[in-house]
Amino acid sequence: MTGAAGFIGSALLCRLLSDVDSGDVTGLDLGDAPPAASGRRLSWIRGGLDDRAVLEQLGAAPFDLAFHLASVPGSRAEAEPVLGRRVNLDASLDLFQLLAQSRNRPRVVYASSVAVYGALSDAPVGVQTEARPAITYGAHKRMVEIALADHTRRGDLSGIALRLPGIVARPRPVSGFGSAFMSELLHALAAGERYVCPVSPAATAWWLSARATVDNLLLAGRIDCCGTLQLPALRLSIAEVVAGLARLYGPERSALVTFDPDKAIEAVFGRYPMLDVRAELALGFSHDGSPVELIRNALRA
């Protein structure tokens, strides 16, 4: 698992290690293994995928299943395009090539992103929607999707790419993500703190908890389906999320939010249309079900 100490990676790692049937796990990250993840079944490699020595360590043993989660976040990749390319594109291609040489056709689950779509219209969005990425991060994600599909076509990998929406609630301080306000809103109101929201109450986004994301990643590792899929998510307005927080923590929490919309942020992260994920739902992928369950899952993940 790459990015194994990250927000999603650490949650997935702990889930895998809690399952005695999941086998041995190798985690890779720039940092140390999460404190909650330990045991004889865990091997840890500290380093980056863009380091040739790290790739050589990974190549020492074959893998049956690989979760590729590591990436440079969108806003940083936009500010530092050379770093973004080295990690998000080149290192991903090198990883796939390494896994393809193992000759046992490993299953590869790749964490892609809704950033591949670019500017959105009011029409429902799904994998059938044309990918027109508007930022470097999204462009690199789309390139890696194509590379994984080509390895799958050639028969040396069994690849599935999942386009992830906004995942909540990232631990504080939330940085490097344009959608950071989604997590900050949940943390602030749950803690009884005042929060100035940079988008309007009517702004809509796609919301998915880390807990539900892990469920979907594990499913992707088990099923035979290959290709690119859009993960289901709840399409909720900020007002609906605030109402859910008020139901859980008390009606007075609604008054803690004030709004100071930033047009640039709302244009990119606050005008999401409906999702068309009928095919993904039929395969067993899922979202959190309701605003209240989303909040519960997000804050206990």
Spans of model-derived segments:
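Active-site Tyr-X1-5-Lys
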Residues: 119, 134-160
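NAD(P)H-binding glycine-rich loop region in Rossmannoid oxidoreductase-like domains
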Residues: 49-87
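Short alpha-helical oligomerization interface
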Residues: 76-91, 125-133
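Amphipathic terminal alpha-helices
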Residues: 274-282, 286-301
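NAD(P)-dependent short-chain dehydrogenase/reductase
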Residues: 149-203, 210
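Mid/C-terminal beta-alpha module of Rossmann-like enzyme folds, strongest
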Residues: 198, 212, 216-270
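N-terminal Rossmann NAD(P)H-binding glycine-rich loop of SDR-like oxidoreductase domains
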Residues: 1-19
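Conserved Rossmann-fold NAD(P)-dependent oxidoreductase catalytic core, especially the SDR/UDP-sugar
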Residues: 93-135
